[in-house]
């Protein structure tokens, strides 16, 4: 193991004017700068841990930061105006009257400029707290159809849940100085929904 602050000139804040702090975002940018002259790079991803990573596409100081959270919830896929047989024809077993549950994995990706002083796109602790307050706490261990008012009139498919999460997060993320880029909600090993917030105009 090596300390980046002392072994990479880019992060020698004591000995070099203009050096940066070795945040995940800045480290990814520095790696790009080192590799770009030798490789035709399109994108780079750097994991700090399994629940936090950054992406860089070579666009000046713009980068993407993703945090992963999870929650457990139950739901039933059915429209009230349809019969049980009609709902089962559309949603299959997911329309059964008493619902079923999932352990959801939630990836929240924000986009922004790497700040020259902090080396971050936004306050990471504030972003995590925002996701906890706006999504995890209100959704965890609930029956979405009955416990989350939005889903009393909207079928809680993975797509609709992801869209609602994007709607809840877009404005608060902007207040942190970043833009909500993407929501990825994994419902099961073979089923996930992705919402690109800017394209969806939530």
Which residues fall in each region the model found?
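Charge-rich, low-complexity N-terminal segments
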Residues: 1-202
